[in-house]
Each structure stands twice: as C-alpha cells, then as structure tokens.
Amino acid sequence: MNFQSKFLTRSQSLKSLLCVGLDPDYCKLPEIIKRSPEPLVHFCREIIDATAPYAVAYKPNIAFFEVFGSSGIRQFEKVIGHLKNNYPQIPIVADIKRGDLDNTARQYARYYFGDLQVDSLTLSPYMGLDTLRPFLEYQDHLVFWLCLTSSPDSIQFQKKRFSETGRTLYEEVAYVANSISPLNLGFVVGATNTYELEILRKQNPDRIFLIPGFGAQGAKLDDLLPVCGRYSLINSSRGIHFASDGLDFAARANQEAEKIHNAMQARFVFL
C-alpha cells in the first residue's frame, strides 16, 4: 500500500489528522528512562504504544538520534522497526530535512526508502529539483518538501518576493513542485501560518500537507481545521510526549493524544 492510501485509510478510520512527533530530547526524558541501556528506544516505544489508538502517522526526528552517533542510529532503526512490526497500518514520516545533489540524494533515498522502508520523509528544496528526483523514483513513498515553516525566522527567506514573478520564496517552491506535479510530493506548511496555509490549500487541494507547529509552538486547532483541508497531517510532538516527566509520562501522552483526537473528531467535517 502506498503512502497516500495508507494515510487516507488511517485518517478516515480514526476521523482524525493527528501526526504524533517523536522528538526524544535526552535532557527532557524521565529519569527512569535515562537509566535504560537504550533510552531513546525505550521512550519512543512507550510513547508509540500509548498513543497508537489515536495516531494517523508518526514522525520521528532523526536529529535526536544522530546526536548519539552510531548508537543513536541503531536506536532510530529499532524505533522504525517497532512501528513497522507492530503498527504496519500507521505511516511513518522520517523527519530528516535532507537536501543535496543527485548522487548524494540517491544514497539518502536508498537508505530511508530502500533499506528502512519508511513511508515518507522531509526534504529541503534549497538546492533545487536535483535533491528531489531520486526520492520520487520510489513511487509508493511520499516526499514532504519544506515550503513554509513555523520557525519565527522563516520570514527572513521564505516570505521574500522574487521581483521577476512577484511570488514569495515559499510560493515559488509550490509553483516548481506543481510544474512537475507528482502526487507523491507534499508540502511542509507551518501551523502558525494560517493565512498562507489557506492560500496554499486552495491552490493545492489534493496535495498532502504536513503541518508542524501545533501545540507547544502555539497554533490552535480552531484556527487550523477550517483552512487545512482533508489531506493534512497536523503534528504534535512535545505537547504529547513531554506532557509529563514523571513515571506517568506514557499515560499522560495517551491522554493528550486522546484529547487532540476527540477535538479533531468534533470540529472537522469529514467527506
């Protein structure tokens, strides 16, 4: 089953758009987890098992694993393995934000799509289409191109206008994507940019959007749901998995995920 089918099946089944981010910042892990031989695996497994009833997708962030070198990469692979072995119906978005020339990009694509078999990942468009093409060859997988992020300093680049076209940089990214138009290409659009999100959705009704910035970064469901559209994954990371730093961290994560799930069901009109 390709990413789009897996996402739509899961989303319709749960009547939700919730993507649970996995950002296992070691400094914030509960003390009992820090004493584990593989703390990142231990923590992520607990969070996954606690939130799986409500997750449309999971988004593990590679940076929190890479900081531990080869041990961290092994732990990342074990987390991916746990998801694929126990929850094969839930799509995985590897948050890697890579962006390099064709030959290098091909190696990334081979590792993440070929070896790990994640369903999707995030890429930076800064170096152009060469960074993208090797990934699009894996037609059952999906690429999320960074379009307009939720970071406060994104305005320094992403909202600058091209004098030739009048388009902003984020609009240019969407324009270029539509010029090649494969549907296994989606956009990352930050939740704090609701005005721009609405415009991008109207221009791209059938593309899947990954929308980070909800929860801990301040965006609210009441603002997002009227404009994000059916083909969206609204991500919450810290707001779920760091709801508690005590022994009840998994139970609290379950409660937070359930709360978001219920709010989405109540406020979103599903076709």
UniProtKB/Swiss-Prot annotation:
Asked if the keyword Metal-binding belongs to this entry, the reply reads no
Q: Name one GO molecular function term.
A: orotidine-5'-phosphate decarboxylase activity
| Known EC number | 4.1.1.23
Q: Which UniProt keywords apply?
A: Decarboxylase, Lyase, Pyrimidine biosynthesis
Part of which pathway? Answer: Pyrimidine metabolism; UMP biosynthesis via de novo pathway; UMP from orotate: step 2/2
> In the UniProt record, does the keyword Lyase occur?
yes
Provide the disulphide bond pattern: none
Query: Please, one GO biological process term?
Result: 'de novo' UMP biosynthetic process
UniProt-listed Gene3D superfamilies: Aldolase class I
Active-site residues (renumbered):
97 (proton donor)
Q: Which InterPro entries match?
A: Aldolase_TIM, OMPdecase_type-2, OMPdeCOase_dom, RibuloseP-bd_barrel
What reactions does this protein catalyze?
A: orotidine 5'-phosphate + H(+) = UMP + CO2
For this protein, the record's NCBIfam families field holds: pyrF_sub2
Question: Do you know which HAMAP family this protein is assigned to?
Answer: OMPdecase_type2 (MF_01215)
- UniProt family annotation: Belongs to the OMP decarboxylase family. Type 2 subfamily.
**Protein known as:** Orotidine 5'-phosphate decarboxylase
Organism per entry:
Leptospira borgpetersenii serovar Hardjo-bovis (strain JB197)
Q: Recite the lineage of the species.
A: Bacteria, Pseudomonadati, Spirochaetota, Spirochaetia, Leptospirales
